[in-house]
């Protein structure tokens, strides 16, 4: 099951290469639907998702409320998150090591998850330009990541139950201003300028999620592959991160968790290869499809 947010903010479903406008399909078939937006569907839960998916399949088979995926310019799956994006830092060992070389810190695997947040106003759609902000930074960098979306909230979640709290996953690009990151010590500002969280294009329900070993997280800059790692190479896996994040702190439906980036970021090269206006980034997470954004 793959869902997306259409240009008008309404709920869509991707059936093969066909996008179904769910509110329009519901109107044509004279049925009630549990949600008309993707954020609303996440709140409604798994049973609602299955009902929407069955409606999408019926509409696709009859060509109702249907468009070719190539003709759709989706928004971010959750265009206006209700809370800051929760992020894991240095969650792949090779990335921790490349950062250590540049920032004079330990390259050992963190003993505990490194957690920070990104502002909700950083979220932008696939295809939307990422500003280069030359007046604010000279060290603009990319970070390809798999992002989880929480479906069932909870506090003090047992690791064995963690996956049942996940609605699905998507791709996110954790754009970072490395000079601001160093200047301010805390990473929030360096990762929260407007446009610093491209996300999408689709949200894949966890029932359609491959095994972590079969998911690759990749990033290309101007067609050159810079990052590639399997999702099972995380230092802190999904059960561990959800358990820690929910320890004494309630997770809510719609919360977004950026799970960490692999090695290959621009700052890791010698000399560093930071982004410039005119560059194009493509984040490709298995099952989600390319998240493409230019830099302006």
Tell me the role of every PLM-derived stretch.
Residues 82-239:
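Glycine-enriched loop-and-adjacent helix/strand subsegments that border the catalytic/binding cleft
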Residues 1-109, 113, 282:
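N-terminal non-catalytic cap/leader segment that marks the start of a structured domain
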Residues 6-9, 42, 60, 86, ...:
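Generic detector of intrinsically disordered, low-complexity, polar/charged segments
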Residues 12, 45, 127, 154, ...:
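Glycine-centered flexibility motif
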Residues 51-53, 67-69, 73, 77, ...:
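Catalytic-pocket segment enriched in acidic/His residues
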Residues 7-8, 13-18, 150-152, 221-223, ...:
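Short acidic-glycine loop/turn motifs at beta-strand connectors
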């Amino acid at each position: 099951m793959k869902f997306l947010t259409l240009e008008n903010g309404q709920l869509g479903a991707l059936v093969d290469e066909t996008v179904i406008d769910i509110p329009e399909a519901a109107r044509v078939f004279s049925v009630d639907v549990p949600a008309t937006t993707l954020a609303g569907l996440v709140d409604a839960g798994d049973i609602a998702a299955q009902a929407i998916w069955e409606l999408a399949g019926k509409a696709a088979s009859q060509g109702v409320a249907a468009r070719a995926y190539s003709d759709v310019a989706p928004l971010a799956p959750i265009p206006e998150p209700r809370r800051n994006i929760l992020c894991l830092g240095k969650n792949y060992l090779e990335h921790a090591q490349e950062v250590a070389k540049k920032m004079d810190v330990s390259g050992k695997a963190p003993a505990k998850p490194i957690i920070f947040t990104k502002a909700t106003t950083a979220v932008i759609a696939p295809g939307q330009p990422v500003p280069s902000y030359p007046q604010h930074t000279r060290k603009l960098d990319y970070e390809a990541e798999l992002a989880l979306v929480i479906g069932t909230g909870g506090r003090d979640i047992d690791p064995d139950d963690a996956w049942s709290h996940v609605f699905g996953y998507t791709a996110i690009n954790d754009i970072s201003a490395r000079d601001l990151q160093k200047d301010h010590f805390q990473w929030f500002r360096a990762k929260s300028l407007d446009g610093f969280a491209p996300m999408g294009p689709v949200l894949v329900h966890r029932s359609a999620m491959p095994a972590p070993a079969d998911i690759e997280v990749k990033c290309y800059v101007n067609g050159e592959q810079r990052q590639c790692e399997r999702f099972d190479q995380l230092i802190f896996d999904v059960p561990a991160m959800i358990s820690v994040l929910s320890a004494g702190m309630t997770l809510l439906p719609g919360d977004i968790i950026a799970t960490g980036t692999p090695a290959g970021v621009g700052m890791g090269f010698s000399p560093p290869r930071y982004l410039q206006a005119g560059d194009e980034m493509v984040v490709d997470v298995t099952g989600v499809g390319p998240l493409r954004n230019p830099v302006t």
